Amino acid sequence: MQHYGVNGYSLHAMNSLSAMYNLHQQAAQQAQHAPDYRPSVHALTLAERLAGCTFQDIILEARYGSQHRKQRRSRTAFTAQQLEALEKTFQKTHYPDVVMRERLAMCTNLPEARVQVWFKNRRAKFRKKQRSLQKEQLQKQKDVSTDGALAASDKDEAPSTLNLENQPPSSTSSSSSMEAEAAPHALGSELSVELNVTSAEQSGSESATEDNATDKEEEIKQHREDLKVEKEPAPGNLSPLCKRLSPKPDSPLGSPAISSSSSGVTGGISQSHSYSSSPLSLFRLQEQFRQHMAATNNLVHYPSFDMATPSSIPYLGMNVNMPAPLGSLPCQSYYQSLSHHAQQVWNSPLLQASGGLPSHNSKTTSIENLRLRAKQHAASLGLDTLPN
């Protein structure tokens, strides 16, 4: 059992120190026989230390020698050559074995313990650097992912807002286009119904409001006055009526509807195209007009409306006798030729068969007048397109 003395230090150490002191005294006594003997400096200093120093210093001197205080090792300063050799070995392996450490110590003139500690510190430094790099990479990935998500969300929001903004205009534009497409059809259907049902005056006023209200109403009033005046001549003479068939010189040739209510459908549609449509479309309009005339003949059932068949003669005659385009002809000669053809038609024996027809009222004559003028308009359209 170990006994502890003063201040917790073991008695064994104190006994060893006393034994050492006793041995030293014995050696000094044996040396006194020599005449020149003097006590050694070491013995004196040791005696002085034992006498004047503290008990802790005695213990430290017994353990570590006369320099009893533990000296701190100075930091090793590696040269460039030593560091280069150590780094090359570290690139090969992070955990060199004892043999590699001994060889490296011999090459670098360093203790093997220093080489081992250097590798330990170098591995710690390497791990720290790797952790920092991983953190940086993770941060960059997070930033990139967040930026990409924000950009994607912005892109998704932008087209959605654009679509929301564009949807009402597109719907309105589609509805407006549908209305624009439906408008000509509605006008055409209304005009055809009015042509079949209403009188000549009402249909004339409808087409007048469509093109030029004041001019057309004046023409219709003038036609009424002419009809009243020319009821007085003989019933067989219908040449004034043929004169009335020719349009006025001051009316423009390019107008789509020449004061005729029955040509309101074709004139209204072709007016929107300003005669820039193809000849096929004009021919289709003419065919539709002929069908419409046949339908009106079937609906009204007047006994005197057999003249619809010879009324196609001026159209054919103008196509045959006038090959030149309409724009190259003087207006007055064109009107005279129209009146000449109309006189031939009205004086033909086909009309003489129904000679007792001046008993028509003003409505029937105005309808005939408007129908023939519509035929004349269709013929002018045919002349415009045939030379091309």
From Swiss-Prot:
Residues 160-169, 195-211 have a biased composition (Polar residues). The gene is dmbx1a. Pfam families: Homeodomain (PF00046), OAR (PF03826). Residues 129-272 are annotated as: Disordered. Belongs to the paired homeobox family. Required for eye and tectum development. May act as a transcriptional repressor. Keywords: Coiled coil, Developmental protein, DNA-binding, Homeobox, Nucleus, Repressor, Transcription, Transcription regulation. CDD domains: homeodomain (cd00086). In embryos, expressed in mesencephalon with strongest expression dorsally, diencephalon, and rhombencephalon. During somitogenesis, anterior expression which partly overlaps the future eye field, gradually decreases while midbrain expression intensifies and becomes restricted to the presumptive tectum. In adult, strong expression in forebrain, midbrain and cerebellum. The keyword Lyase does not apply. It comes from the Eukaryota. Gene3D superfamilies: Homeodomain-like. GO terms for cellular component: nucleus. Residues 71-130 bind DNA. One of its GO terms (biological process) is camera-type eye development. InterPro entries: DMBX_homeobox, HD, Homeobox_CS, Homeodomain-like_sf, OAR_dom. SMART domains: HOX. A motif (OAR) lies at residues 365-378. This is Diencephalon/mesencephalon homeobox protein 1-A. Residues 206-232 form a coiled coil. It is found in: Nucleus. Residues 251-272 have a biased composition (Low complexity). Signal peptide: none annotated.
